[in-house]
Each structure stands twice: as structure tokens, then as C-alpha cells.
């Protein structure tokens, strides 16, 4: 049983050496250890505060990013709307100009057709007049073989000219 229950002298020397070690540690070791623990605690507290600030800043940045994305989407929508309006305007203007050009072209073609028609009518009238003169000349030559018929014809024509004027 001596192993389980130490002698009283051994207990005395164990308590004395424990007290001396404890006193030395209390005087020199514990203040250093406490100072190191407090320094570590301060460092951890500062790190936690920095982490909180970083989280808050991250949240603000995230909100700002979302606001920027929302503004960009709004701006994109506005730009798309303006582009669609501009496209419609350009299409409208192009159609309008095409209609004007087509109308001008149509008017020019109509005018050209009218000019050609008038020229054709004049040409036909000239040809009819020439044919009429040729026919009249041939008829008159046949009918006016004698002098008296010629003089009668001249008198009738002069009378017609005078009555018309």
C-alpha cells in the first residue's frame, strides 16, 4: 500500500516544491502568460471587428453592385427603347422617301408618255394633212382641167377664207 499512500515526509516535500514552483510561476510566469493571453484576446477582438466591418462593407458593395446592375438594366431598356424608336423613325422616313421617289418616277413616266402621245398625234396629223393635200392636189388636177373650173374653185376658196375670218 505504500505506493498508493505516500509518506508524510514525501507529501511535505512535494507540497514545498509545488509551492516554490507556484510562487516562481506566479511572480514571473503568470504575468507573462496573462499578458500574452490578453494580447491574443485583443488581437482576436480586433480581427473579429475587422471581419464585421469587412462583412458590412461586403454587404454595402453587394447592394451597390445590385443597384448598379439595376441601373444598367434600366439604362439598357431605355437605350433599347430609343433604338427601337429610331429604327421605326428611319423605316418610316425610308418608306416616305421611297413613296415620294416612286411618285416622282410615276409622274415623270406619265409626263413622258403624254409627251410621246402628243408627238405621235402631231405626227399623225402631219401625215394626215400631207395625205389630204396630196389627195386634194390629185383630185383638183383631175377636176380642174379647164380654166373656168379653176377660176370657180379659186373664188369659192376665197369666199370660205373670208367667211371664216
Curated annotation (Swiss-Prot):
The keyword Amino-acid biosynthesis does not apply. Keywords: ATP synthesis, Cell inner membrane, Cell membrane, CF(0), Hydrogen ion transport, Ion transport, Membrane, Transmembrane, Transmembrane helix, Transport. CDD domains: ATP-synt_Fo_b. One of its GO terms (molecular function) is proton-transporting ATP synthase activity, rotational mechanism. The chain crosses the membrane at residues 10-30. InterPro entries: ATP_synth_b/b'su_bac/chlpt, ATP_synth_F0_bsu_bac, ATP_synthase_B_chain. F(1)F(0) ATP synthase produces ATP from ADP in the presence of a proton or sodium gradient. F-type ATPases consist of two structural domains, F(1) containing the extramembraneous catalytic core and F(0) containing the membrane proton channel, linked together by a central stalk and a peripheral stalk. During catalysis, ATP synthesis in the catalytic domain of F(1) is coupled via a rotary mechanism of the central stalk subunits to proton translocation. Component of the F(0) channel, it forms part of the peripheral stalk, linking F(1) to F(0). HAMAP family: ATP_synth_b_bprime. Belongs to the ATPase B chain family. NCBIfam families: ATP_synt_b (TIGR01144). This is ATP synthase subunit b.
